[in-house]
Regions:
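Extracellular beta-strand ligand-recognition surfaces/modules
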Residues: 112-120, 152-154, 161-164, 168-215
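Extracellular/lumenal carbohydrate-interaction signature centered on repeated Trp-anchored short motifs
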Residues: 80-93, 165-168, 194
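Short carbohydrate-recognition loop motifs
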Residues: 55-75
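Bacterial N-terminal signal peptides
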Residues: 8-18
């Protein structure tokens, strides 16, 4: 007879182990890996307790990760570490999200207003240097704008306004060609450029700069390789 503790341990392993598959509509020879939202962990800011303002909701359509920022909280970023054997293989990232509360006047293209209802970041690393593309669902920033560019010895980062405004509570699907995006933003459009390891995916909702509430749900993260 299997003990209750053994059953719980087995369930945790099953839930945290990503399972590759090929989805209908994906080109032959490519596989899809679902990233379980239960496996996202705090990577910036507080790491435990009520200060971590994210939790998993077991919704009828599947699990989702919900973030609800309140003024006065320290900003927390959640992250998923990509398995080492896939870091050079990933072609696309897919997910769905819905805004639940827009930070008042949040505008990532203006200093001091850079709060987002939701963001998804893709991180590559070569040696000590990080390359980050942050895709945001903004309150009011112009759709398609690229803002908050940073270029230092250890960090290259761009923020892309992927969605702006709109109704709350409405799911939107997203697809990003991550290899093409790296080439366009960090390699001057050189299709032959060497792409560093894609090491992680992050997400965040925040309202610390505008001192306002913000919130979002994320679900159905997948990488295509």
């Amino acid at each position: 007879m299997v003990s209750r503790r053994a059953r719980a341990t087995l369930l945790a392993l099953v839930l945290s182990t990503p399972v590759p598959h090929r989805a209908a509509g994906d080109p032959p020879g490519q596989s899809v890996l679902a990233l379980d939202v239960r496996a996202f962990r705090p990577v910036e800011g507080p790491t435990s307790g009520p200060a971590v303002y994210y939790h998993v909701v077991d919704a009828p359509e599947g699990p989702l990760l919900r973030g609800a920022y309140r003024p006065g909280l320290e900003t927390v970023t959640m992250g998923f570490e990509i398995p080492e054997n896939l870091r050079q293989k990933i072609r696309r990232l897919r997910w769905s999200w819905r805004a639940r509360a827009f930070p008042e006047g949040g505008n990532e293209c203006r200093g001091g207003r850079g709060d987002s209802a939701a963001s998804v970041s893709v991180a590559w690393k070569r040696g000590l240097k990080w390359y980050v593309l942050k895709y945001v669902w903004s309150s009011v920033a112009p759709l398609g704008e690229v803002c908050d560019r940073k270029r230092t010895l250890l960090l290259a980062r761009d923020t892309i306004i992927l969605e702006s405004g709109g109704a709350t509570g409405r799911w939107l699907p997203e697809v990003v060609d991550v290899r093409r995006a790296f080439i366009d933003h960090f390699a001057g459009g050189d299709a032959g450029a060497e792409i560093p390891d894609l090491v992680g995916v992050g997400l965040m909702t925040d309202g610390d700069q505008t001192n306002s509430e913000s919130g979002a749900d994320w679900a159905r993260f997948e990488v295509v390789y």
